[in-house]
């Protein structure tokens, strides 16, 4: 275990990535076994086995004897939630204050999340207005509590002719840099409203039209149903109070 400057014991960067991935998989309702974890991380089964043993020794992970499912201990969940909070706040800082794109910000946040102390993380949180979610709409845990959010349903299930509000981009979608860039460039982000123009199941796509005033209104985007299944929506035009907007003071702080 590594030591942070504020005196808190932290898992190493690699260990934190394992815990974060397990957290994501549990959040998707997937039973986590070593083989699935290796596939998700793109590493060998032997590498995962070695890390699982290490995390078990450090009291962060347990393995069910019969099913071989991997479960985080309370200490493991705490470590994963702390890392995710730092990652999410870093993404807000990088996208809304510094101006990076979603994909670049996600990559940079993986570096920042291991460098921030709790003190600095708390100050960033305050500067950003304590966002309840990451920029992609996934809830940020604080003090062991995760804010209640609507569950929503997959965009791929929406019917032609309906209006939908983007609720969140799942962690699975966040792992695809090209998809993140595509979504950002086309305004498919939490809080934005679209009309489902067409669902072409025979070719596996759906077409959306942005519902907004000004230049952004009427923009059409065609997205694959496989990608749409990784997005969550609310039916109709949802209350915009659900969606965080970074305070102007944060942007002013960046420009001096």
PLM regions and their residue ranges:
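Key DNA-contact positions within bacterial/archaeal DNA-binding proteins
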Residues: 46, 103
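Short, hydrophobic-biased segments on the C-terminal half of alpha helices
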Residues: 52-53
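Basic, amphipathic "hinge/linker" alpha-helix immediately C-terminal to the N-terminal HTH DNA-binding motif
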Residues: 67-87
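Glycine- and charge-enriched low-complexity intrinsically disordered segments
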Residues: 217-256
């Amino acid at each position: 275990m590594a030591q942070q400057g504020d005196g808190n014991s932290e898992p190493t960067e690699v260990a934190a990535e394992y815990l974060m991935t397990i957290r994501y998989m549990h959040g998707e309702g997937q039973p986590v076994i070593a083989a699935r974890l290796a596939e998700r991380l793109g590493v060998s089964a032997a590498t995962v086995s070695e890390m699982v043993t290490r995390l078990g020794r450090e009291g962060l992970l347990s393995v069910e004897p019969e099913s071989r499912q991997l479960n985080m201990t309370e200490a493991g969940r705490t470590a994963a939630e702390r890392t995710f909070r730092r990652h999410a706040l870093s993404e807000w800082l990088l996208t809304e204050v510094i101006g990076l794109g979603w994909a670049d910000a996600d990559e940079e946040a993986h570096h920042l999340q291991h460098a921030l102390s709790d003190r600095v993380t708390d100050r960033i949180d305050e500067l950003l207005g304590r966002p309840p979610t990451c920029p992609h709409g996934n809830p940020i845990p604080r003090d062991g509590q995760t804010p209640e959010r609507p569950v929503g349903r997959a965009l791929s299930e929406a019917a032609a002719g309906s209006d939908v509000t983007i609720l969140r981009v799942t962690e699975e979608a966040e792992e695809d840099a090209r998809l993140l860039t595509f979504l950002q460039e086309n305004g498919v982000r939490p809080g934005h409203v679209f009309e489902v123009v067409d669902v072409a199941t025979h070719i596996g796509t759906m077409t959306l039209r942005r519902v907004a005033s000004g230049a952004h209104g009427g923009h059409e985007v065609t997205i694959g149903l496989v990608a749409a299944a990784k997005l969550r929506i609310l039916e109709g035009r949802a209350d915009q109070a659900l969606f965080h907007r970074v305070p102007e003071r944060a942007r002013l702080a960046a420009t001096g």
